């Protein structure tokens, strides 16, 4: 069998995959079934493997397949049925050319009587789901995680336009936590966004304490990260001012298989004690009766570039799905997450200059554990009706030691959350317009018990459950959310009006003071999304939506400068355009957020700070282009860039009026080049951001403790090279890379945490990746 040859036409540009056959080349093999085993992944790669395996000629327009994914192929197939299976969900269909040759073409648009109900707006985060979304939305998939050597959610999120995910800092200065902010919102513990995993709330108390000091999600168990910055608040909440982030877990394989991966990284110029390693494993498949299951594991061991940063994370999941027929589908998810980490803490300017890798806080340590159980059912009797119901239960412990001035504290906190969400969607026609009406309801009940024990720092003794305590509170919330929307397709227009209504009742009992406090409030959230198709590959979108932030347990009953604490409220506006012809993918959007009644908690003195009104305006844009469409010389070379301008201002009258919201760089973006010749992959990437401030006063001069002062901007570069050994070697893939090539010195600050100060950024770091499939 001779090597695969690639040809191109100039108009339109075409990739032609040809394979010379053995002596039987003159015969047609399309009528004979053969055993095939092709793993899910890139559609281009899957088609290439299938052509090589089955011995046929396939002419492919590169713009049709670029960027698309395939579910793989396992079993006995003739050529045509195998191609159809590989193309499932791609929007393409196979066309015979005769003489054992085939080509691909776009599948015809569905007729009105063939419209299919969507139901879940997030869905599987497919390319078409993103393209048809009437708002800013980006999905980063598993194959993209490795390009920059990412091992944490922070590293992936930080490359999305409008998202700022700083280095671990403050009480979230460990990999069990998550810090990110969208469009200038404070990134501390990611409390301004709705964060989900397969549609299930990630926070241990979604309404009463949404801060992700414990974020029980691991990158190794994910297929994709879906970030909906606008146009999703009518379906998802609360805390939706900063959009919706959904972590999509790995799909259950169609056929039984084992996949494993590992990455190790080392920062030679730092004081790293042990190389940091991350591991992931998936074992599972689907039987002929429609029952499938998969065991997922992701683990982390080692330390970061600073002293006192040792980390251990174990994240185990069991996913199951049973589809006895095309009408009924059952699914379940079980998770056990357990981790612990030392926290290096912030440094003063003097300590940073002496040794930026050191830690001056030997007692700070965090640990947490979460158990999750979810069960879902889908009933879809035909393509026009769909009913879903999902129930879930989580039990979470988060605890740790923290030095707070003259005391060392131990703060065990337990949380229990129960929820259920039925949803129904139906399509019907009214004249020339197609309507998909969705209606849903979510009930969520959460309860908490928080303690804080202490000992004197001077004693050098860590507190325990028998030590004195100064906090003993029990809190709870009952939340009801109803939503109704109508997706109207008429001509080239898609118009979706909707309404979400939330009713929340929360309480807190303080056993020390003997007080009982309650709050009850409603939040009506109207929304309107509009999408217009200029062509099949180019659309315009606009939307406006209401969103809100809940009254948190720490805010109940506390008087603040502006009066009694009220729910945070915001109104978001978006206008943008999206283009995707296969070779060029581009998006540009403008946004405006008017955010009222905004509050932040100060951990150093247990107070609530009223920032009041803030206004967030800006531009987000990104593009990816395949240079092979210009000339065959640049085949397999693609470039990409993203940029976000964010102007987040305090608009509350007072001394800080007009100042920038803390931790909101005005300019931020990425650049990169990918080159894939044959089995090799070469990646060059960079990210940059401008300066920012740490406090509402926008203090420029640095304080001695390092907590305030301008935070300088920076630009970092990374590179990676990988080789895919192919299916003959269990799809072994090995890669070597480096982060922060030029060893740029940069840092972030923590302002209102007990372990505030300067946190050094990641120095030059070498890493190695390996993965295989059986």
UniProtKB/Swiss-Prot annotation:
Keyword Transmembrane among UniProt keywords: yes
Gene Ontology biological process terms, A to Z: intracellular iron ion homeostasis; regulation of DNA-templated transcription; response to iron ion starvation; siderophore-dependent iron import into cell; signal transduction involved in regulation of gene expression
SUPFAM superfamilies with a match to the protein in the record: Porins
Listed Pfam families: Plug, STN, TonB_dep_Rec_b-barrel
GO molecular-function terms, A-Z: siderophore-iron transmembrane transporter activity; signaling receptor activity
Annotated signal peptide: 1-33
Name by which UniProt lists this protein: Fe(3+) dicitrate transport protein FecA
Source organism: Escherichia coli (strain K12)
Phylogenetic classification of the source organism: Bacteria, Pseudomonadati, Pseudomonadota, Gammaproteobacteria, Enterobacterales
């Amino acid at each position: 069998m001779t090597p695969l040859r690639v040809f191109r036409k100039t108009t339109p540009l075409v990739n032609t995959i040809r394979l010379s056959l053995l002596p039987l080349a003159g015969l047609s093999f399309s009528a004979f079934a053969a055993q095939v085993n092709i793993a899910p992944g890139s559609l281009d790669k899957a088609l290439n493997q299938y052509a090589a395996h089955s011995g046929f000629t396939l002419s492919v327009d590169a713009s049709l397949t670029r960027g698309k994914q395939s579910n793989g192929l396992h079993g006995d197939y003739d050529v045509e049925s195998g191609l159809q299976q590989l193309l499932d969900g791609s929007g393409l269909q196979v066309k015979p050319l005769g003489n054992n040759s085939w080509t691909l073409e776009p599948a015809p648009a569905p007729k009105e009587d063939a419209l299919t109900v969507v139901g879940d707006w997030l869905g599987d985060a497919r390319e078409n789901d993103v393209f048809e979304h009437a708002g800013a939305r980006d999905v980063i998939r598993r194959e993209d995680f490795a390009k920059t050597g990412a091992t944490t959610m922070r590293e992936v999120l930080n490359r999305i336009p409008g998202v700022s995910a700083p280095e671990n800092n403050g009480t979230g200065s460990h990999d069990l936590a998550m810090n990110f902010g969208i469009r200038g919102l404070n990134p501390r513990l990611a409390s301004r966004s709705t964060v989900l995993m397969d549609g299930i709330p990630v926070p241990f108390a979604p309404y009463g304490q949404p801060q992700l000091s414990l974020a029980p999600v691991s990158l190794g168990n994910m297929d994709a990260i879906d970030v909906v910055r606008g146009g999703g608040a009518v379906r998802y909440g609360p805390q939706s001012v900063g959009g919706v982030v959904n972590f999509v877990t790995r799909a259950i394989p169609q056929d039984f298989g084992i996949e494993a991966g590992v990455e190790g990284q080392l920062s030679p110029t730092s004081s790293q004690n042990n190389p940091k390693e991350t591991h992931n494993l998936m074992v599972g498949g689907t039987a002929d009766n429609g029952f499938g299951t998969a065991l997922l594991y992701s683990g982390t061991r080692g330390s970061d570039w600073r002293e006192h940063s040792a980390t251990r994370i174990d994240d185990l999941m069991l996913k199951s799905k049973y589809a006895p027929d095309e009408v009924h589908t059952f699914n379940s998810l079980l998770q056990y997450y357990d981790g612990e980490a030392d926290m290096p803490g912030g440094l003063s300017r003097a300590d940073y200059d002496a040794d930026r890798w050191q830690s001056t806080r030997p007692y700070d340590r965090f640990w947490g554990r979460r158990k999750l159980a979810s069960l879902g059912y889908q009933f879809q009797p035909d393509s026009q009706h769909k009913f879903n119901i999902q129930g879930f239960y989580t039990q979470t412990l988060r605890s740790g030691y923290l030095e707070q001035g003259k005391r060392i504290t131990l703060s065990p906190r337990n949380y229990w959350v129960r929820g259920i969400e039925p949803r129904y969607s139906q399509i019907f026609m009214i004249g020339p317009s197609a309507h998909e009406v969705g209606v849903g309801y979510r009930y969520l009940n959460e309860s908490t018990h928080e303690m804080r024990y202490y000992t004197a720092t001077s004693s050098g003794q860590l507190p325990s459950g028998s030590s004195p305590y100064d906090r003993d509170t029990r809190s709870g919330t009952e939340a009801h959310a109803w939503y109704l929307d109508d997706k109207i397709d008429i001509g080239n227009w898609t118009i979706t009006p909707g309404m979400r209504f939330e009713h929340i009742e929360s309480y807190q009992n303080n056993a020390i003071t003997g007080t009982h406090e309650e709050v009850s409030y409603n939040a009506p959230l109207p929304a309107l999304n509009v999408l217009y198709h200029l062509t099949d590959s180019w659309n315009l979108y606009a939307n406006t939506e209401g969103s809100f932030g809940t009254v948190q347990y720490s805010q109940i009953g506390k008087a603040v400068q502006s009066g009694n604490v009220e729910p945070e409220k915001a109104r978001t506006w978006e206008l943008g355009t999206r283009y995707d012809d296969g070779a060029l993918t581009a998006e540009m959007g403008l946004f405006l957020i008017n955010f009222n009644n905004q509050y932040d908690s100060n951990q150093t003195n247990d107070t609530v700070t009223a920032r009041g009104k803030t206004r967030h305006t800006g531009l987000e844009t990104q593009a990816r282009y395949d240079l092979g469409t210009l000339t065959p010389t640049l085949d397999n070379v693609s470039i990409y860039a993203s940029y976000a301008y964010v102007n987040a201002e305090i608009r509350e009258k007072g001394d800080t009026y007009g100042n920038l919201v803390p931790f909101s760089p005005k300019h931020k973006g990425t650049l990169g080049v990918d080159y894939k010749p044959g089995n090799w992959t070469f990646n060059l990437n960079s990210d940059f951001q401008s300066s920012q401030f740490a406090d509402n006063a926008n203090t420029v001069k640095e304080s001695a403790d390092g907590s305030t002062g301008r935070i300088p901007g920076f630009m970092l570069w990374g590179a990676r090279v990988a080789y895919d050994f192919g299916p003959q070697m269990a799809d072994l893939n090995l890669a070597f890379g480096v982060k922060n090539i030029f060893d740029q010195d940069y840092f972030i600050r923590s302002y209102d945490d007990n372990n505030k100060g300067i946190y050094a950024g990641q120095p030059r770091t070498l890493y190695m990746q390996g993965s295989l499939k059986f």
